[in-house]
């Protein structure tokens, strides 16, 4: 078994790991080994590079770990999907490319936790800006020279996007021009991680492309981290597998775990760091009994509220195989056309109750009726809203099943375990129906296909949610930051009770953010990269941001149509 030595070893070349690899190797005197269990991000594979093909990677295992949950007790005991990215780019290689940073109050709320005072929104905003190049240029809220290409909505988009945003406004909710700017709350255009040439802007493209030629960075693909090695309480290296061969590497400074909210706690537990009782079940020598490793697991759950479209303007024809070669050719040659968009070009965030301090419901609008993973396409022109709650009080866990690094862990999100979950999902369905009833959609709106117009009572809505709600693919919080008894890392990602070991990815969020997780994960890695390098944090950006302060969630007086009596 060969052993080589580096300053830093990074386990996982995903949304966070690629940021760290790039930033740390800006110092030519620092050496980094980046380990990735998957393969390269093949630039000629349309499945990962074409934005419109986003469903394809979830349908196989080349780019997807394809985890599955244990039977979810509140979801008809369904085993539910938990897709995570595999390959350079991690989940940024297979996600929906929605660039959503979260609400300012997410971060202000984090900062109220002991030891996390420097995680306010104004502390985080400089790192969002540092990571971003927005196609319309920088401003107080956006960057213009970062590795992540962000594309904004353009003229000529599908008319259903504008109609759905207008319908939300007609229902009495705010309009916002920038879901990542002054005000997240409301309906408006959605930014996307797509390059100016119409390609997916994964962190492999944005970050690793500028770093992979550096002599102080070694990238090893098809390398599955097996265990973190320890010298007493100090992380000293990593053993990993390449096929049937085992290798090890020594870290002079630190081991950085960036394997995501499922695999990071799995790797820690396999290495002897986690709840002592769980480790004893598998006869794993305990390095540190750290009870929070794998606990506090959170996700976003969502539903598809689907309608028939009376006019032939949806993407339904693009689902037919005979139309796809033309779409693919235009995208391949010009980077334009239907293939160059993820087709999540509008959405929004609302509060369903006036006493909600910031939005608790997210919308993605889509001009076709189909599941996120490409299944269950409705055979007609249609459109839908993906809608789900943002900060469920339900908590799950990731638990090691086996010492075999190839074995998937036991995953239980414990979806819909709390009464608030059910209230929010009922509210969301009823609010969506009210939005869809507005005049802006009159020319397009046909029959309600799902849940169906006859599904009205609380009991009927709950039955629909149990049977049909799906993951939004946002697992997080399983190695949370903080200083309480269940915290795993401190405010800089350093694992409590150990030396030379950090976790840097979505697993360290203490509470899930309001929206998609790719942008916040990149920000977290940018912020902690400065800590690792011993650099002063970027100066806070003193800009205003919207706070509801008890304002009405919806201006009923301005609503064009009132809700039907149920």
UniProtKB/Swiss-Prot annotation:
Lineage: Bacteria, Pseudomonadati, Pseudomonadota, Betaproteobacteria, Burkholderiales
Function: Involved in the biosynthesis of the osmoprotectant glycine betaine. Catalyzes the oxidation of choline to betaine aldehyde and betaine aldehyde to glycine betaine at the same rate.
Catalytic activity, as annotated: choline + A = betaine aldehyde + AH2; betaine aldehyde + NAD(+) + H2O = glycine betaine + NADH + 2 H(+)
Cofactor: FAD
Name of the top EC class for this enzyme: oxidoreductase
Gene that this sequence comes from: betA
Gene3D superfamilies hit by this protein: FAD/NAD(P)-binding domain, Glucose Oxidase, domain 3
Family: Belongs to the GMC oxidoreductase family.
PANTHER family xref list: CHOLINE DEHYDROGENASE, MITOCHONDRIAL (PTHR11552:SF147), GLUCOSE-METHANOL-CHOLINE GMC OXIDOREDUCTASE (PTHR11552)
Pathway info: Amine and polyamine biosynthesis; betaine biosynthesis via choline pathway; betaine aldehyde from choline (cytochrome c reductase route): step 1/1
Name by which UniProt lists this protein: Oxygen-dependent choline dehydrogenase
């Amino acid at each position: 078994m060969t052993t080589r030595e580096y300053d830093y070893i990074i386990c996982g070349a995903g949304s966070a790991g690629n940021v760290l690899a790039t930033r740390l190797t800006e110092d030519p005197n620092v050496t980094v080994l980046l380990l990735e269990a998957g393969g390269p991000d093949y630039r000629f594979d349309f499945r990962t590079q074409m934005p419109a093909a986003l469903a394809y990677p979830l349908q196989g295992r080349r780019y997807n770990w394809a985890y599955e949950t244990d039977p979810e007790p509140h979801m008809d005991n369904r085993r539910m999907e938990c897709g995570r990215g595999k390959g350079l780019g991690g989940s940024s290689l297979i996600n929906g490319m929605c660039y959503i940073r979260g609400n300012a109050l997410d971060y202000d709320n984090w900062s109220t936790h002991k030891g996390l005072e420097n995680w306010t929104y104004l502390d985080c905003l400089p790192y969002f800006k540092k990571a971003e190049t927005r196609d319309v240029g920088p401003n107080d809220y956006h960057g213009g020279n970062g590795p992540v290409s962000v594309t904004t909505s353009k003229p000529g988009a599908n008319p259903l996007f504008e109609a759905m945003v207008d319908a939300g406004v007609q229902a009495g909710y705010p309009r916002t021009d920038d879901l990542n700017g002054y005000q997240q709350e409301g309906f408006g255009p959605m930014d996307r991680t797509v390059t100016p040439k119409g390609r997916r802007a994964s962190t492999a493209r944005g970050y690793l492309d500028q770093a992979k030629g550096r002599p102080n960075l070694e990238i090893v693909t098809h390398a599955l981290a097996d265990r973190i090695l320890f010298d007493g309480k100090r992380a000293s290296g990593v053993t990993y597998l390449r096929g049937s061969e085992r290798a090890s590497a020594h870290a002079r400074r630190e081991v950085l775990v960036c394997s995501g909210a499922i695999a990071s706690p799995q790797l820690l537990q396999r290495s002897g760091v986690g709840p002592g009782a769980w480790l004893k079940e598998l006869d794993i020598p305990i390095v540190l009994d750290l009870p929070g490793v794998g606990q506090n697991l959170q996700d976003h759950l969502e539903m598809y509220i689907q309608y028939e479209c009376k006019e032939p303007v949806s993407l339904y024809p693009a689902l037919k195989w005979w139309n796809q070669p033309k779409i693919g050719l235009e995208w391949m040659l010009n980077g334009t056309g239907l293939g160059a968009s993820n087709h999540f070009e509008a959405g929004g965030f609302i509060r369903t109750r006036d006493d909600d301090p910031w939005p608790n419901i997210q919308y993605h609008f889509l001009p076709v009726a189909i599941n996120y993973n490409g299944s269950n396409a409705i055979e007609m022109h249609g459109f839908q809203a993906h809608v789900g709650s943002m900060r469920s009080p339900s908590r799950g866990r990731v638990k090691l099943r086996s010492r075999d690094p190839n074995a998937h862990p036991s995953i239980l999100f414990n979806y819909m375990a709390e009464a608030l979950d059910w209230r929010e999902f009922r509210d969301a369905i009823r609010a969506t129906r009210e939005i869809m009833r507005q005049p802006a959609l009159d020319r397009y709106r046909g029959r309600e296909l799902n849940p169906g117009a006859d599904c009205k009572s609380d009991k009927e809505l709950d039955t629909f949610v149990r049977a049909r709600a799906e993951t939004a693919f946002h697992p997080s919080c399983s190695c949370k930051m903080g200083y309480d008894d269940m915290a795993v890392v401190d405010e800089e990602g350093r694992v409590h009770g150990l030396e030379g070991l950090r976790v840097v990815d979505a697993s360290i969020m203490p509470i899930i953010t309001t929206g998609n997780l790719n942008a916040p994960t990149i920000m977290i890695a940018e912020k902690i990269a400065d800590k690792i390098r011993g650099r002063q944090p970027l100066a806070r950006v003193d800009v205003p941001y919207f706070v509801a302060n008890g304002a009405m969630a919806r201006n009923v007086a301005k609503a064009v149509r009132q809700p039907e009596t149920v």
